[in-house]
Amino acid sequence: MRFFSLFIHRPVATWLLTLTIVLAGFLGFRLLPVAPLPQVDFPVIVVTASLPGASPEIMASSVATPLERALGRIAGVSEMTSSSSLGSTHVILLFDFDRDINGAARDVQGAINAAQSLLPSGMPNRPSYRKVNPSDAPIMIMTLTSDTYSPGQLYDYASTKLAQRLAQIDGVGDVTVGGSSLPAVRVDLNPQALFNQGVSLDAVRSTIANANVRKPQGAIEDSQLRWWIKTNDELHTAAEYRPLVIHYRNGAAVRLQDVATVTDSVQDVRNAGMSNARPAVLLVIRKSPQANIIDTVDRIRGEVPELRNTLPASIGLDIAQDSSRTIRASLHEVEQSLAISVGLVVLVVFAFLRSGRATLIPAVAVPVSLIGTFAAMYLCGFSLNNLSLMALTVATGFVVDDAIVVLENISRHVEAGMKPLLAALKGVREVGFTVISMSISLVAVFLPLLLMDGIIGRFFKEFAITLSVSIAISLVISLTLTPMMCARLLRPNAPRQQPRLRGFGRILMAIQRGYGRGLHWVLDHARWGLLVFVATLGLTVYLYISIPKTFMPEQDTGRLMGFIQADQSISFQAMRGKLETFMRIVRDDPAVESVVGFTGGSDTNSGSMFIALKPLSARSDNAQQVISRLREKLTKEPGANLWLMAVQDIRIGARQSNAGYQYSLLSDSLDDLRQWEPKIRRAFSALPELVDVNSDQQDKGAEMALTYDRTSMARLGIDVADVNDLLNNAFGQRQISTIYQPLNQYKVVMGVDPRYSQDISALNQMYLINKEGRSIPLSAFAKWQPANAPLSVEHEGLSAASTISFNLPEGVSLSQASAAIERSVTSLGVPASVRGSFSGTAAVFEQTQSSQLWLILAAIATVYIVLGILYESYVHPLTILSTLPSAGVGALLALELFNAPFSLIALIGILLLIGIVKKNAIMMVDFALQAQRQEGMTAREAIFQASLLRFRPIIMTTLAALLGALPLALGSGDGAELRQPLGITIVGGLVMSQLLTLFTTPVVYLYMDKLRRRPRWLPVEEKS
């Protein structure tokens, strides 16, 4: 330890070293990004393809399957799911954590190109892909409203001008425009008029397509000039299409306006969007993988004034919801907790040392250690988030420990009359090894975390490194700056203390004397002490097995997501009414600030809602209580359900579902899947551990099944392709031509007038023109009858799939729900052809259950190895580790007392306790070993003296760690539900370990000392 004496003799160099650490930390702090949690984004790519008018089964077989076969060959794909609905297919690719998203995107594009020849020729566009996770909650929602512009015009502004600009902002991954569709010229045909005029639907389609053509015409030039040829070959508005001549009948022209209603409308009239009670077009913005939410939101807000300037004055552009508000509030709460922790820790030092000069030393050491950590965080690419700031908050109790141990030992020599400089040199030499042992063994706790991969490794890495760096800086400061300041600030003859402080000192001395008497009794009855140790070990195991467990604490981010699912045969008009009803119910709740929603498109019986709650200070209930209150009202609406879930800062997987957790069913037999899925879903619905049970299997949609008489068709001169074209032209909202404009392209959409498509009798009015020019009614060769058909077809890994989603009621943990599901599935006797498993967050939770125990054991083993190396002993590390069971009992009992399930955050607390409570034993064992080796004391005399000498620093360090974590445990502001399990675990573990280990550790030391003297296979040094 002579090296550290240089810093005591060279104060200028020491201060400059400290200043360098502080300046680097301030610079790093200013450059650090802000985020809710460490970056744990999964690489996800969504491939989208469309074929207007195609049924879900056709989309699944002709579009999804060829794409899946090509995409499934890409390396690093961990999960591939697809969903095919009316005219639309989405294939979601979830990649391994270490897969580069840009490289994966190149492979995806190559697979799409390879599958192109296998896709239907009638697709209006090639399949496209987006690098965005569709299950992520949006970071911002904007609304466009107007009293003068139609929804189609608003949608045009949103998709043409706003979405393009927003998508260019760094960090924006996807901008979805909802609530309407692009403007289009709609041709609504009258089947009866067509029959009377002898005109086929395909003739109308062909006429329109040929009348709107955009092709180059070339140029004419002479010796002087060149003239470009321009014709009126394009039609842009409904007024230009109406006079088109379709046919001549008896010498008279039959125009389009004679057989159809031609209007300037939208591509898909079955779309609706609402913002609170007002029709609106929505811009739903999601971030790209690895993007920072706060930075992205700030960039978007910076663009809003310019975006508003591009719009007409009568169009309002508003930010309806912003996810950064609660994130900023939560981080502000953590920063407050950090400041309070620092203040409490300094007060502990002042209360024990009763000297302002002495208190100033750790008051400098703690901020320097914390501030210096920011530099390392920046160099590692970390962010200021809840976990990293929680690490710094907890670190206040750790970083002060080293300073306290050094300061207390030097103060003891100064109080004994030694000069401060000599006391500093002797004090740091005596406890230098102890401080190094405590710090290295504490950092060793996190080594297994740093070596882990997957979600836990990625999630814990930032916390572990932040805490480890702060401890490392604290170690350097405690052995350099702290003894140097002690040598210059402490005084041998301090003035008399105030009576109140002398009173505190007398109380502490009385407690220490009482502890000495109690320790005498315990050492005289060592077997009872050993029995207590064994009992705490058994109780720890029992509590760990029995305590409810979950993945992460349920957060209140101030945002809810709602998913509407109505009867599968519901009309769009009725579905829009359900949306308005549900939005009104939600909007009337006193905790709700705003609500936006939309329905329509390919999802004919579903809709989505995004709800912003009032700030936590303005409402009395948390998000789960609001959901429970609304659930009672929402269940009264017949024919539809609205499922709500609280938005979480971390959600695992890429599945879009109507609830927070998923259970997937796979089968190679679609019939088996459709037979067993309803049975399993009903069984889950009966479980009290689950609520909002629903499924994505929708196979009860209304279908009109047509059966062709092929013999009659051959006799009448009609083939199947002609009939399919007829039906597609009539009912498929077929896009038959493209209108080119400077900023966008629009479609001409053809179909029968809605009056003729709202009743099955419309099929009786369908006619074909055969090869002989005769009108043949559809009924002459086809029969039809109602049937059921799927509204969507789901695949996972080329197997038929169905996902059952569920939420948890208040007071039920994920482990309890998982166990109930497993029991239910077992009791049903589901055949082997139907395979069930958890997916998303629930799947990762199942995987982490076994790894948690191994992680704790690995941390203990690592600490044992490090301590064994430091002490050159097999036995003494066991003495130090004997403090852990009591801490485990305290932590788990505290979680039970506060009704908090064991989560990943609580696991962090357990790992921290492994590092904290062993410090007490290290201080005892280190001094006891010195006394035995240097003064020839017996083991009992040595451990008794060490316990009394180290009583004050043990109490100080424990109180410092406890009070450092107390603001986390007692916090009640934004994000408190994420911080509380960590604080509760640490406080509970410290209280219990402090009460027990002061007595059990000396007992274990005596038994271990006897043990190390017996075996002959131990090293010679151990037996001496």
Swiss-Prot record:
Keyword Transport: yes
Subcellular location: Cell inner membrane
Highest rank taxon of the organism: Bacteria
Keywords, ordered alphabetically: Cell inner membrane, Cell membrane, Membrane, Transmembrane, Transmembrane helix, Transport
GO cellular component: plasma membrane
GO molecular function: xenobiotic transmembrane transporter activity
Transmembrane portions of the chain: 15-35, 333-353, 360-380, 387-407, 431-451, 463-483, 528-548, 853-873, 897-917, 953-973, 984-1004
A family per Pfam: ACR_tran
Membrane topology designation: Multi-pass membrane protein
NCBIfam families (UniProt xref): PRK10614.1, RND_permease_2
Recorded family membership: Belongs to the resistance-nodulation-cell division (RND) (TC 2.A.6) family. MdtC subfamily.
Subunit organization: Part of a tripartite efflux system composed of MdtA, MdtB and MdtC. MdtC forms a heteromultimer with MdtB.
Protein name: Multidrug resistance protein MdtC
Native species: Erwinia tasmaniensis (strain DSM 17950 / CFBP 7177 / CIP 109463 / NCPPB 4357 / Et1/99)
Classification of source organism: Bacteria, Pseudomonadati, Pseudomonadota, Gammaproteobacteria, Enterobacterales
Protein encoded by which gene: mdtC
